[in-house]
Amino acid sequence: MMSELLQQQTWRVIDHTSLGPSFDAKQSFAFDDALCESVGSGQSQPVVRLWVHHQTVVLGIQDTKLPYIEKGLAYLHEQGWRTIVRNSGGLAVVLDEGVLNVSLIFPDTKKGIDIDRGYEAMATLIAHMLPEAHVQTGEVVGSYCPGSFDLSINGKKFAGISQRRIRGGVAVQVYICVNGSGAERAGWIREFYERSLAGEQTKFTYPTIVPHTMASLSELLSKEMTVSALVIRLYEALQAFGSRLEPSSLTPAEWERYYMYFQRMIDRNETMLPT
């Protein structure tokens, strides 16, 4: 399956994979909003941004409505996890040094990029990055943040996709569990939900996490995979679609927008999470 969204003449490449433990996940969502605005207004070529965060659980808006969320958060914090609420769709996911995040940022054209086209472009890219595997698309029941565009190998989920649209730009974001234990990551989220629900029935159905439904690429391919090696595969896949890659950083105008969006993320988190 080819996706015309991947056949861009030029991609700006912004690599945030090695900024270390002080790199706050709230910053990533602010970066993507700032870049969406640039791409959406025609001031920038499409962007591919790569990012890694240490020991962070990223919650969805729906997670903030859990009846005993303060108990779930306390558990995660005791285990050394930071927590934030993102501004795109979905539910709780785990980020750590073994998880590569990729954002593809496109202009939302006059015809409009429908939601499925954005998801399909990312799924196609990941499949091209992993030619030795049969990557399947479809909800993996029992995984965390389940959705119809879960990516799996042999029925075990290793990646999930979300989208964010703002000011004429579309950010399609994926997390990829590259190495480490997928089941262990899922175990943290299962415990978070169990403590945050404490047996109470809710209108919204939160996922029942079955840890063995999730795995990393290292586990699934039976070979050690690294974030840096997967980044190289991503570059090669984009070039195979005929694109030129242009290493880049934010412009002064983008930094200005970034600081505005970062403050919004800080304010949002202060409002939505119990202190």
Curated annotation (Swiss-Prot):
Catalysed reaction(s) here are: N(6)-octanoyl-L-lysyl-[glycine-cleavage complex H protein] + L-lysyl-[lipoyl-carrier protein] = N(6)-octanoyl-L-lysyl-[lipoyl-carrier protein] + L-lysyl-[glycine-cleavage complex H protein]
The site (Lowers pKa of active site Cys) lies at: K157
Gene (name only)? lipL
CDD domains with a match to the protein in the record: LplA (cd16443)
Q: Which family does it belong to?
A: Belongs to the octanoyltransferase LipL family.
**Biological process (GO) annotations?**
lipoate biosynthetic process; protein modification process
Q: Per its record, what are the GO molecular function terms?
A: lipoyl(octanoyl) transferase activity
Descriptive protein name: Octanoyl-[GcvH]:protein N-octanoyltransferase
Q: Further notes on this entry?
A: The reaction proceeds via a thioester-linked acyl-enzyme intermediate.
Checking InterPro entries in the record gives: aa-tRNA-synth_II/BPL/LPL, BPL_LPL_catalytic, LipL, Octanoyltrans_LipM/LipL
Per the UniProt entry, what species is this protein from, by scientific name?
Anoxybacillus flavithermus (strain DSM 21510 / WK1)
Residue ranges occupied by any BPL/LPL catalytic domain in the UniProt entry: 42-246
Q: Which cysteines are joined by disulfide bonds?
A: none
**Known role:** Catalyzes the amidotransfer (transamidation) of the octanoyl moiety from octanoyl-GcvH to the lipoyl domain of the E2 subunit of lipoate-dependent enzymes.
Active-site residues per Swiss-Prot or TrEMBL entry: C145
